């Protein structure tokens, strides 16, 4: 492995700079955040162009809009939201409005987090987002703990966090940086993923002030560099976005004793680690009385959750869950098939994608390759209890399975769908439930 002294020096500089970050007044931290969006805008065209070239997207393709949305707009949006909250704290207000924190009928606390501004309402009219707080935490505790880092009298000492960056979406790594600096109060070393390390120079420009003041370092290399940094004594904590295999390699090791360590819960890593590892995400369609326009619109919705970023998303839809008793199920599948078939082609760019597509489709009856190549596939009528790869292994590419579950009523179907998602599908990162307003109103207790 090259550049071990440089890696050691980077971590030493972060360790030395950490107290300065902790002592920086909130007003100054906000000012540093406010300087980021103009820097993002400054490099946005070149950053988007670099990403589209790396992903094999033609300069005339409509897919280019994706980069501007998920890798640039989301970046700026997250920063502006953070600024909004911190300015409220600076002014002596609670981080969120009191009426945004409320308790549901079952006693669980819910926080309304989007829209937060008039701009949000204008841009994404009709959309809303909530955070559901862990059961047992009261509304009063939720309000008291919000932005606790900036409202406590005795803040904890900052740690050096190693961020092992995501290779699929650059904005994940960028927001991990914001999370560590501003939400957790840590300084951080970011090991860029080799798949998208071309974004590193842009981030070095955007975060240049944080780097120059010793609060952030961007580092490059493969698994050997990541392993060295993870076990370095000057790294206190780790956050990883990647595969379960990468997590296992970091925590349990890769030698012939790794399986034994895992079986006996003797991790090789002796420090806290958090991770987002993806999984098999369901798209559950609650049966209802849908029009032809409804079917087409929701088919486009389903296809989008599968095809965005060529399917290289940790929370991409992998299994479409339908009621076997719904008369419109076949029509919805036909619409999904048509949308995916007619979508503009784009190559899978993530390493190993072709092998994962092959593995997911191998031996599966009803596999249809769509769009004229083998990069997109629909597997209809997957047996929910077959243990098929599409149900247990994250594909991270353009394969969509369809499972039909019994349920003559909405309540019966939802019970079966939730049980299937929780007990059969691997992981718990995300799920989508789509239900038409009339059916939802009629089955509010379901």
Residue ranges of predicted features:
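N-terminal Rossmann-like NAD(P)+-binding subdomain of aldehyde/semialdehyde dehydrogenases
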Residues: 1-145, 180, 192-194, 206, ...
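Conserved C-terminal structural/oligomerization subdomain of aldehyde/semialdehyde dehydrogenase
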Residues: 2, 17-35, 154-155, 162, ...
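Conserved short loop/turn motifs at secondary-structure junctions
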Residues: 33, 66-67, 192-196, 318-324, ...
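Active-site-adjacent "gating/activation" loops or surface patches in catalytic cores
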Residues: 125-175, 184
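PLP-dependent aminotransferase-like
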Residues: 160, 172-224
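C-terminal substrate/ligand-recognition segments
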Residues: 163-179, 192, 403, 411, ...
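Generic beta-strand/beta-sheet core signal
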Residues: 164, 189-193, 219-221, 232, ...
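ALDH superfamily catalytic-core signature
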Residues: 204-211, 215, 225-227, 231-233, ...
């Amino acid at each position: 492995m090259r550049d071990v002294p440089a890696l050691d020096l980077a971590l030493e500089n972060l360790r030395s700079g950490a107290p300065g970050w902790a002592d920086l007044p909130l007003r100054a931290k906000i000012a540093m955040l406010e300087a980021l969006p103009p820097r993002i805008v400054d490099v946005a065209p070149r950053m988007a162009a670099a990403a589209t070239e790396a992903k094999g997207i033609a300069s005339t393709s409509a897919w280019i809009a994706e980069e501007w949305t998920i890798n640039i707009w989301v970046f700026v949006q997250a920063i502006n939201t953070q600024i909004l909250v911190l300015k409220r704290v600076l002014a002596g207000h609670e981080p969120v409005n009191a009426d945004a924190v409320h308790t549901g009928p079952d006693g669980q606390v819910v926080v309304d987090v989007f829209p937060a501004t008039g701009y949000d309402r204008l841009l994404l009219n009709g959309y809303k987002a909530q955070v559901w707080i862990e059961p047992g935490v009261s509304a009063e505790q939720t309000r008291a703990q919000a932005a606790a880092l900036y409202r406590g009298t005795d803040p904890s000492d900052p740690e050096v966090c190693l961020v092992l960056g995501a290779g699929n979406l650059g904005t994940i790594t960028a927001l991990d940086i914001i999370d560590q600096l501003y939400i957790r109060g840590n300084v951080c070393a970011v090991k860029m993923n080799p798949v998208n390390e071309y974004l590193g120079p842009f981030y070095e420009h955007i975060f240049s002030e944080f780097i120059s003041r010793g609060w952030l370092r961007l580092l490059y290399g493969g698994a050997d560099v990541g392993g060295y940094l993870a076990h370095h004594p000057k790294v206190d904590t780790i956050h990883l976005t990647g595969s379960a295999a990468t997590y296992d390699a970091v925590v349990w090791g890769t030698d012939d004793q790794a399986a034994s360590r895992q079986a006996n819960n003797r991790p090789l890593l002796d420090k806290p680690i958090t991770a987002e590892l993806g999984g098999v995400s369901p798209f559950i369609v609650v049966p209802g009385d849908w029009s032809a326009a409804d079917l087409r619109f929701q088919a486009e919705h389903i296809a989008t959750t599968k095809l965005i970023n060529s399917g290289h998303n940790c929370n991409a839809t992998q299994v479409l869950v339908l009621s076997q008793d719904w008369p419109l199920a076949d029509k919805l599948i036909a619409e999904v098939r048509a949308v995916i078939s007619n979508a503009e082609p784009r190559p899978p760019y993530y390493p190993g994608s072709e092998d994962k597509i092959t593995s997911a489709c191998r031996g599966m009856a009803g596999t249809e390759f769509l769009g004229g190549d083998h990069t997109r596939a629909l597997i209809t009528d997957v047996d929910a209890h077959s243990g098929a790869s599409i149900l247990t292994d994250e594909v991270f590419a353009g394969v969509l399975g369809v499972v039909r579950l019994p349920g003559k009523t909405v309540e019966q179907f939802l019970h079966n769908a939730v049980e299937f998602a929780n007990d059969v599908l691997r992981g718990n990162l995300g799920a989508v439930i789509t239900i038409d307003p009339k059916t939802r109103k009629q089955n509010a207790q379901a």
